[in-house]
Amino acid sequence: MDFILGGVAACGACFFTNPLEVVKTRMQLQGELKSRGTYQVYYRNVFHAFYTIGKIDGLAGLQKGLVPGLVYQFFMNGVRLGSYALTESLGYIHTDGRVSATKSTVSGAIAGVVGAVMGSPIYLVKTHLQSQSTSSIAVGHQYKHRGMTNALFAIHKQHGILGLWRGASAAIPRVSVGSAAQLATFSASKEMVNDLQVFSEGSWLIALSAGMISSVVVVLAMTPFDVVSTRLYNQPVDHLGKGMLYRGFVDCFSKTLKKEGMTGLYKGLGASYFRLGPHTILSLLFWNELRCLHQSYS
């Protein structure tokens, strides 16, 4: 049941934050491997990106990739949050009745790796669909998929089953780092807020406060990995399915750092927080409340 609750909670958050994911993806691909001032800026900031996409691609453009986004969140976070909840219920993340920073971080990272591997094909398709736009504001390589199913069949037909896991080398560090940061800080923050007795015991405000603290840590830790992941998933490939811009995670990381500097790895930081912040807060809040609701009826 923990796996289903985790998936449902993440889907609830995804429905509200998907437009922010579209904006984040576009901003991370803008000026790829180009020095500042040498490329046309279509999206000046988060708000300008919202306006531009809404104006040129239409309001539906802001919800591009929603279907694969929901599928990805259900399976990836279902496995990730469900695995973590299982280790938590077995008492593994606690030492002497208190949350262990080391154990909760390791548990979060392992849960993230499992979720990332399972969800990688859907994340690949989601990235392709969210980067697709009208030519006048296009950034990154433009695939011409007609939808999630069409994309999965097209990739499988051209590059085989392994082609669906292209980019997984970036997804694993991305999700493991993000998961470790998110779940460890959420567990510790929830315990801290409880100790301060700011809210009544069992209040949903405890989970909300812990989620807000966790969201800041997640964005700072995850953004460089998120930029690399987006670029690896979206890069054009040759007839053998090999990337034409990057050989893998380390190559993409080093090329981005060399060409665009440290700011390149934090491209779209504002968009990342606007997306990952609310998503982290909402998914953790929904997850916590659904678990409490399930426990009260079981």
UniProtKB/Swiss-Prot annotation:
InterPro entries: Mito_Carrier_Antiporter, Mitochondrial_sb/sol_carrier, Mt_carrier_dom_sf. Its main location: mitochondrion. PROSITE patterns: SOLCAR. Keywords: Membrane, Mitochondrion, Mitochondrion inner membrane, Repeat, Transmembrane, Transmembrane helix, Transport. The keyword 4Fe-4S does not apply. Pfam families: Mito_carr. This is Solute carrier family 25 member 35. It comes from Danio rerio. The gene is slc25a35.
